[in-house]
Amino acid sequence: MKIQSMFQKDINRDINGVIKVSQDDQQSLKQELSEYIITKELRRHFATFFDNYVKAIDNPTDKIGVWISGFFGSGKSHFLKMLSYLLSNKEVDGKHAFDYFADKFDDPMMYATVQKCVRIPTESILFNIDIEGPINKDKTAVLRVFAKVFYNHCGFYGEDLKVAKLERFIDKQGKTEAFRAAFKEVNGDEWVNARDSAAFFEDDVVEALQSVLGMSETAARNWKNSEVDPYFLCFQTGSF
């Protein structure tokens, strides 16, 4: 018998040496979920997280921050990615994330705790703050990153918080589709394709706002000149 035949999986398969947030294709996700090993140390960390998480289900709390620390290469990103998959319980290759962990939790109590947690409908937003962050590292940089990825996740244009704020306002009026149709009629292009250049199509945006929301021209033009407060935008996330 050859040594390579003693292993359950093909030892010549491609294995990612570094786990990256951006690697979210189905094949990579399936490999990460199916081949993730819960060591004794990781079992303790999973237990700590989910024991506290499950408490908040029965007794809601605002103490929701979690700090994951460790040396470079210790598996922080991998652990965080697994938590993200489990909480959202996303479907990968026809199988939910929790099902990939069915035989990884050898403690029945821990298994039941995690199962209770993943039953709560949850959306996870996984991102690398260094990649998503702005070049200008001022005191609002972190807030702007969180606002950006959150609004992108909601379908708004988080790359430009003024545009995202405008889209959020239109959406609250229930006029998103009507606005997009009105914009296309005057501009000729789809709003989602043109919104990254919205500042150059101010007249078209204004005309669409007037048509759909019945705003005056002055009020419609104010969106471009309005200030964007990242503190307020982050506070607004609680209304979603």
Question: PLM features: residue spans?
Answer:
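Low-complexity, highly charged intrinsically disordered N-terminal segments
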Residues: M1-I37, V186-A199, Q236-S239
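N-terminal pre-Walker A segment at the start of P-loop NTPase domains
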Residues: Q31-N59, A102-F105
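Short, well-ordered amphipathic alpha-helices
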Residues: T48-K55, L83-N89, F150, F240
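Structured alpha-helical segments in the cores of large, soluble enzyme domains
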Residues: F49-I57, P108-K116, G238-F240
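Short coil/loop residues immediately preceding or within conserved phosphate-binding loops
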Residues: K63
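P-loop NTPase motor core
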Residues: V66-F71, L80-D203
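Conserved lysine of the Walker
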Residues: K76
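Conserved helicase/translocase P-loop NTPase motor core
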Residues: V206-F240
